[in-house]
């Protein structure tokens, strides 16, 4: 499995708190990790349409979290965009 417990803990520790995994930044960082992994998979497997669909759904979930963060805390939004290298 590409997303081990250690990787999750590392992401949560870096982008939030180790115990607060529901923080918007932590969830966005986790979605970004999964999106990058699925993107690499789709480069090798062009006809994997189920993975392509799940990638689109993940991008939508991340976008909605980013919109929420932008509406509530613009400074935290700008930090996470810059830190993860996400386009606006």
Curated annotation (Swiss-Prot):
Any one GO molecular-function label of the UniProt entry: rRNA binding
A Gene Ontology biological process term: translation
Keyword match Nucleotide-binding: no
Any one cellular-component term (Gene Ontology): cytosolic small ribosomal subunit
Keyword terms, alphabetized: Ribonucleoprotein, Ribosomal protein, RNA-binding, rRNA-binding
Entry's family note: Belongs to the universal ribosomal protein uS15 family.
Name of the protein in its database record: Small ribosomal subunit protein uS15
Organism: Flavobacterium psychrophilum (strain ATCC 49511 / DSM 21280 / CIP 103535 / JIP02/86)
Phylogenetic classification of the source organism: Bacteria, Pseudomonadati, Bacteroidota, Flavobacteriia, Flavobacteriales
Gene: rpsO
């Amino acid at each position: 499995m590409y997303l081990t417990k250690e990787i999750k803990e590392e992401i949560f520790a870096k982008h939030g708190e180790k115990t607060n995994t529901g923080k918007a930044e932590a969830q966005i960082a986790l979605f970004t990790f999964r999106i990058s992994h699925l993107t690499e998979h789709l480069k090798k497997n062009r006809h994997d349409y189920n993975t392509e669909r799940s990638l689109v759904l993940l991008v939508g979930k991340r976008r909605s979290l980013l919109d929420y963060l932008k509406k509530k805390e613009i400074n935290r939004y700008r930090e996470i965009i810059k830190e993860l290298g996400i386009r606006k």
